Each structure stands twice: as C-alpha cells, then as structure tokens.
C-alpha cells in the first residue's frame, strides 16, 4: 500500500481501523517531500519535528476514542504561507516578512488542529498572493509536477503542486481572484473557493480584504468537501464571517444531478479560449445533460469588464493593506537609513518584489484624488453590475459551468515578460470573487497539442459556480462528474 496515494478520508479511516498509524502517514509524506522538493519546490518551510510530535499525540487521542467523527484525524495537511501558524515562519513569499513568526494561529488552523489534522509546513506562493504563476516568490518558483518546465499556477501554486506531487493529502490555499481554482486546474487537482464569509479570515495576511477567501485543495471532491466542513463557520474574530444554517458539505457527496439547472455563459466560449479547453468543458456539459440535468446557454452580462474592475479594486485594497510594512514594528528593515522617511522608502523598496510594487503603485494611483472617481468608483459600479448579473442568472439556474482558465499551464517565464497576459489568465475566475460566490475547479481532461509556450499532456480544469452559500450544489455536481472519470496522475520524480 502506497500511503501517499490514498485520499485523506481513506487515510483517516485506515488510521482509525488500526491498519496504519499517524506516524507512518507523516513519515511517508515527509519521505515524498524529501525526494521531490529539489524538483518541485512546493514548500517554503517544513515542520517535520513538530509534525512527528503531533502525530504521537493524535495517535494516542484516536486510540482513546477521540476524533471518531473527524474525517481529517491523523491527516497531514500543508498550509499556504500567508496563513498564520503559531511558532512557524509565515513569509507570504516575501523578503519583507522573511523572518516573521506569528504568535498566534489563524482560526482555520485552530479548526484543523481541533479535527486532529497534522500541519506539515508552509507552501510556496506568489509574493503576497499577487500573481498567477508562483514565479513572483522571493524564494524561487514552484514547478508543475506534470512537467517541471511549466508553471503550477498561482498564487496558491505551492499548495496545488504539493497535493499533485503527493507531498500533502490536502492543502489550504487562498483565493482573491482565482488563486485556488487556477492552480488546481493547472496541477490536475480539485479546489474550492467558498462563498465570501463562509471561512474565517482571521490570521490570513490580507491582500484585498473584500475579495480574499481561504479554501481547500485536494485530489478528490470528497476531501475538499470534508476539509471545507471542518474550516467553515462563524467566528467572533472575523466580523465578515457569516453564520450559515448548515456546514454539512459531506452530505452533498452523492452522484445525482437530475433536475439540476446548469447555465453555460456564451461569452465564456468566445475568442481567447483554447480549443482543447472548450472541447473538454463542453463534453462535461453534455455529460451533465445525459445524467438528467437541464443545461442551457445564456448571456452573462458585464463579466467582460470583470478583469479591469478586479485589478483596480484589488490593487487599491492592497496598497492600503501593505502600507503597514514599513520597517518599524516587524518584518524586514533596511540596514542603512537617515531619518524616518528614508527608512520607509528603502525598507519597502528593498523588501517588496516587482509585481507587488506594480500593484501597490496601481492602487495608489486609482485612489488618488484626481483619479478616484475615474477608476476606483467606476470599478465599484462594475462590481455591483456583475453581482446583479449573477443574481439574475441564478433566478434561472442552480449552477453555472465554464472553463477555469483560457488554456492549460504555460511554460515557465512566459507571464513574467508580459504582465497583461498573466492578468488575462484570470478572466473566468475574478468575477466570482467580485460577486462573492462559491466555485469549484476540477480536472476534465488533458491537453494534446504542444507549442513554443505550452506542452502536451497538461491538465485542463472546469469551473462550477454556485449561488451564495450554494456550496452543496457545486459539490454534488462536481462529485457526480468525478465518479465517471478515471483521473490520470502525473508521473512523479522519485
């Protein structure tokens, strides 16, 4: 039995049935990390000594009858490096936080620990979650386990790569404009971006506070649903966190879409979408129709303006959130300065990477007095129109189906020379964040064509978008599709 190939739910069940121990699961995972990390670079920090100590404690607790109802008891989990874990370095993949060690746990970490999960370490990401390739990390780029010449996506690229490379059973990521769904699509795994307010953001280092949301990445819909069930729920430490009627997402794991109304936005399948992606996504639509779902095309208005609106709003919020990193209280401080102004200037200039500086400059510009109405206010109006457009769509449909990305993963280095191309890679995902909706990305095929900037045999993902707090519908549809497919896995380097 290859332990690292099990799903998280299978692993936890075998631990409870005494077919293997928590320590064996943790050791098997760290063995995979040691073999593969030189090639993939999924992690920034690993936590082997403490993970093994936790494994021993969790094993004793399980044998004493605790965690009987937890689907994650004994499961090794990776955490994106912008989520605070007490006593563990949390860098946001930035020089400016290179040595920052939080004195507290994020709420999601407390909930994972309460469920008996084991924290493996912190995964690589785009600096401060600004990027969609995981190439802007101060600690170096992460490689896609399907092909190390290709990007894993971003900004949660380390989390997606770790799961795909069997270096973690589950990983937490964050999604501000597609940063869970896009790398999940590129790495051939499953990722859920929950409804805004479903999961507490307490302990998440902020990028754009009205858009950020924490969610799970795993190798199955079941593992994603189980993890989301554990980390969801109201939290007094996050005023934007909503108390929902139910967080029982595991009950949605049934193969039945009869009568489910699925909308296909025509605009998602127009110019700019790779032909192979279009083919596989439409095949999934045909499958749902065969299974008894009601599938119809429709026009989703205003989403063509989602990308520019998103980058105006997200950059504006980032310029405010990142103003706290000035070398005074914590984080990197320049060694040589003359006066407070020079301390600020040199610390920020030396501590932030180019992409972060670019977005902070955009944010400061659109918030300036001469351009506030021309850019920021207009972007907020577009955001409202997009939300209204989705509201009208969900009067007719239960879920919306489309591609996660315009194409499969490109080769490393392509986006760094063309930031606009990187921004446009989020064209199908950012509108979901602007509207605060839930969405899941799951694999639906592999690419066949290769060229100078892309390779054959790379995963293609589709996206299912739900109504606010409609996670159960998208999980049910995703699970139904998953049950009919034999998913290929990458040929990993050992």
Curated annotation (Swiss-Prot):
It is an enzyme of class 6 (ligase). GO terms for biological process: translation. GO terms for cellular component: glutamyl-tRNA(Gln) amidotransferase complex. Its EC number is 6.3.5.7. The keyword Metal-binding does not apply. Pfam families: Amidase. InterPro entries: Amidase (IPR000120), Amidase_CS (IPR020556), Amidase_dom (IPR023631), AS_sf (IPR036928), GatA (IPR004412). The active site is at residues 80, 155, 179. Coiled coil: none annotated. It comes from the Bacteria. One of its GO terms (molecular function) is glutaminyl-tRNA synthase (glutamine-hydrolyzing) activity. It catalyses: L-glutamyl-tRNA(Gln) + L-glutamine + ATP + H2O = L-glutaminyl-tRNA(Gln) + L-glutamate + ADP + phosphate + H(+). PROSITE patterns: AMIDASES (PS00571). Keywords: ATP-binding, Ligase, Nucleotide-binding, Protein biosynthesis. Belongs to the amidase family. GatA subfamily. Allows the formation of correctly charged Gln-tRNA(Gln) through the transamidation of misacylated Glu-tRNA(Gln) in organisms which lack glutaminyl-tRNA synthetase. The reaction takes place in the presence of glutamine and ATP through an activated gamma-phospho-Glu-tRNA(Gln). NCBIfam families: gatA (TIGR00132). Heterotrimer of A, B and C subunits. HAMAP family: GatA. This is Glutamyl-tRNA(Gln) amidotransferase subunit A. The lineage of its organism: Bacteria, Bacillati, Bacillota, Clostridia, Lachnospirales. The gene is gatA.
